[in-house]
Design a protein with these regions (language model features):
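A domain-level signal for the structural core that forms small-molecule/cofactor-binding pockets
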Residues: 1-179
C-alpha cells in the first residue's frame, strides 16, 4: 500500500494482534477504512440555504421531526446516531425542509459531540431564518456508551433553544420534546 493512512491503520491493527497480511477478510480493511474516514472527515463548505419570505397568513410554528443523522464521537471515533427535531416560529422567513436536512448532514460529518451538534445546527438555522423562536433537539444512541465500560444502553438527549424559547427556559423545550 502506498497510502500512509491505510499503512498506519494496518500497523494499528497489527498492534492489536490483527494481521491484515495473513487474514484475507482483513486484507483490504486498512484501505477501505482510510477511504471511509477521508470521505467522512473532509468537510465540504456549508451548504447554501436561502430563506424565503413568510407566506401571507403564515406565522405558526414550523416543526420538522425525525430527521435521521449519524456522526462519530469525537472522543472515541465510534458512531452515534439518532434523530433531530427542529421547531421554529418564523419572524419573516422560512426555509425548505430539505435545507434543514442538508445543514444537519453538514454539521454531523465530522468528529462531533451531540451537544455541539445541536448548537451548531441551531446557530446555522438562526443565522438564516432569524426566527422569533427556535428549538433543536437530538435523541441519539451513543456507541461509546454501549461499547465501553459497563456497556450502558439508552438514548441521550441534547437541546439548544434560541429567541423567545430560550428566554422562556426549558419548559418550552419539555413541551415540544413531547410532540
Amino acid at each position: 500500500m502506498n497510502d500512509p493512512a491505510a499503512n498506519a491503520f494496518a500497523a494499528f491493527l497489527a498492534e492489536l494482534g490483527l494481521n491484515c497480511a495473513t487474514d484475507l477478510e482483513l486484507a483490504d480493511t486498512p484501505r477501505r477504512y482510510a477511504a471511509l474516514l477521508r470521505e467522512w472527515f473532509i468537510q465540504p463548505p456549508r451548504p447554501e440555504v436561502n430563506a424565503v419570505p413568510l407566506p401571507a397568513g403564515g406565522g405558526g410554528p414550523v416543526i420538522i421531526k425525525d430527521l435521521p443523522f449519524h456522526s462519530l464521537c469525537v472522543h472515541h471515533i465510534v458512531p452515534f446516531f439518532g434523530h433531530v427535531h427542529v421547531a421554529y416560529m418564523p419572524a419573516q422567513h422560512i426555509v425548505g425542509f430539505g435545507a434543514v436536512g442538508r445543514l444537519l448532514d453538514w454539521c454531523s460529518r465530522k468528529p462531533q459531540l451531540q451537544e455541539r451538534l445541536v448548537v451548531e445546527l441551531a446557530d446555522a438555522l438562526e443565522e438564516v431564518l432569524q426566527p422569533r423562536a427556535l428549538l433543536v433537539t437530538c435523541k441519539a444512541r451513543q456507541m461509546c456508551m454501549e461499547m465501553t465500560g459497563a456497556t450502558s444502553h439508552g438514548h441521550t438527549i441534547a437541546m439548544a433553544a434560541r429567541g423567545e424559547w430560550a428566554e422562556q427556559g426549558l419548559e418550552i423545550s419539555r413541551v415540544l420534546l413531547a410532540l
